[in-house]
Design a protein with these regions (language model features):
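A conditional alpha-helix N-cap/helix-loop micro-motif detector
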Residues: 28-31, 61-62
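Active-site-adjacent loop/helix micro-motif of nuclease/hydrolase catalytic cores
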Residues: 55-66
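Nucleic-acid nuclease catalytic cores
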Residues: 73-99
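Helix-rich interaction surfaces within compact, conserved domain-sized segments
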Residues: 96-113
Length: 113
């Protein structure tokens, strides 16, 4: 049976046990051009992950999220957008919203206990 994603919290609860690796941060911050890296935004210590429910599209991002995603890509940081759409989990890397991929940190199936 396919999962149902009524909101971003439901999507997060579904994917969280399937994620492995580094610290996760949402793409919610704006880092103005020229701002020093005071909060280690670009330190390779975390994977930036934004969650959305609905049809995959760059238009799903708020303008501040889109701007920050551009900065992450510009600084060669791992940044992904995950969409929960019609019972499927779709990941898009960086600014490429045309091709869904399975990232190395995601295990689509988890062992049942």
């Amino acid at each position: 049976m396919k999962p149902s994603f009524k909101d971003e919290k439901a999507l997060w609860e579904y994917i969280r046990p399937r994620l492995r690796g580094r610290m996760w941060s949402r793409v919610e911050t704006i880092c103005p051009d020229g701002m020093f890296d005071a909060h280690a935004f670009f330190g390779q210590s975390q994977i930036w992950l934004e969650l959305k429910v609905g049809k995959p599209s760059i238009k799903a991002l708020r303008p501040s999220q889109h701007s920050f995603l551009i900065e992450l890509v510009r600084h060669d940081q791992p940044a992904w957008t995950c969409f929960g759409c019609r019972g499927e989990v779709l990941f898009f890397e960086g600014l490429d919203f045309d091709t869904a991929v399975v990232p190395p940190f995601y295990r689509p199936s988890i062992a049942r206990s």
